[in-house]
Amino acid sequence: MKYIPVYQPSLTGKEKEYVNECLDSTWISSKGNYIQKFENKFAEQNHVQYATTVSNGTVALHLALLALGISEGDEVIVPTLTYIASVNAIKYTGATPIFVDSDNETWQMSVSDIEQKITNKTKAIMCVHLYGHPCDMEQIVELAKSRNLFVIEDCAEAFGSKYKGKYVGTFGDISTFSFFGNKTITTGEGGMVVTNDKTLYDRCLHFKGQGLAVHRQYWHDVIGYNYRMTNICAAIGLAQLEQADDFISRKREIADIYKKNINSLVQVHKESKDVFHTYWMVSILTRTAEEREELRNHLADKLIETRPVFYPVHTMPMYSEKYQKHPIAEDLGWRGINLPSFPSLSNEQVIYICESINEFYSDK
């Protein structure tokens, strides 16, 4: 068996055709037809009114926070079990991230812990739909409304996921997506900010375009940023969007093969009730942290790449000064593994991965 990476993009649609159109037209920077086409199609498919492209998923989060007016002295509640970009974006604004633990069943942010962490400085709750499984948005939105808080959805890992029949990204005041090369759809590097609020949308456009005023050419009235996506990236994104349903369907098939064939000593991250899980990364739990490293080494010997589940951000040096224990997130972070999950994986490859895992557990 050849080397199996943990992820690789599937560029099997009209990516080359659309990129060549950009090259032929010479519209290769942040202006061009594909920007608008991608934004419009993305908004339509995700059932939101407004969508604006950005250069990556991290700046999408920063832009969303800026649009909400989050700044120094504010607190933003965020799960500790997440990729660090979610937390860093809060720090970029001068606000303070307040960490919450995870739910043991779903791995998503704990609603009960959110409630305990709200203070008079809290301005927003940032929900991160970890590995493609939605958070409990009904309870989170209800809690946020009762406390007059903004809700930001970080959908970087959950494009196409649904909670009670509604797409993630449609529950919050503002939501973000990432299109890095290992995401469900990719632009190479890129992101999107979506909202149903025209004021927030306009603020995003203003900040992402160097703070350019609308009433006078080359007049800037705020300190803005260059967070724009290129036309070439948008062209790739549009081609990816046209294949998105097939990508997600295949990823769910892959997850089913894993669930049906992996040794019962391993716990597979599953789909909860009322949730449509897109399985960005099919993830498993070993019994101990030591066993995880042994299994990862075993799989590496079999030419199978894996990743550790994210380490809780509150344990990292720049965020651990006021350490508080978050036991569930810490447990998941030490025992979890991400398995190869990209759409072009063959059934034969997935079965080989399952057999390699089962071989490891054959004498356990």
From Swiss-Prot:
Activity control: Divalent ions have no significant effect on activity.
Summary of pH dependence: Optimum pH is 7.5.
GO biological process: O antigen biosynthetic process
Gene3D superfamilies registered for this protein in UniProt: Aspartate Aminotransferase, domain 1 (3.90.1150.10), Type I PLP-dependent aspartate aminotransferase-like (Major domain) (3.40.640.10)
One Gene Ontology molecular-function label: GDP-4-dehydro-6-deoxy-D-mannose-4-aminotransferase activity
EC number(s) on file: 2.6.1.102
CDD domains for the chain: AHBA_syn (cd00616)
Null mutant phenotype: Mutant is deficient in expression of the O157 LPS antigen. Increases adherence to cultured epithelial cells.
Swiss-Prot/TrEMBL catalytic activity: GDP-alpha-D-perosamine + 2-oxoglutarate = GDP-4-dehydro-alpha-D-rhamnose + L-glutamate
Residues with the N6-(pyridoxal phosphate)lysine modification: K183
Pfam families: DegT_DnrJ_EryC1
Top-level taxon: Bacteria
Family: Belongs to the DegT/DnrJ/EryC1 family.
Quaternary state and interactors: Homodecamer.
Functional note: Catalyzes the synthesis of GDP-perosamine from GDP-4-keto-6-deoxy-D-mannose and L-glutamate. Can use only L-glutamate as amino donor.
Identification of the protein by name: GDP-perosamine synthase
Organism of provenance: Escherichia coli O157:H7
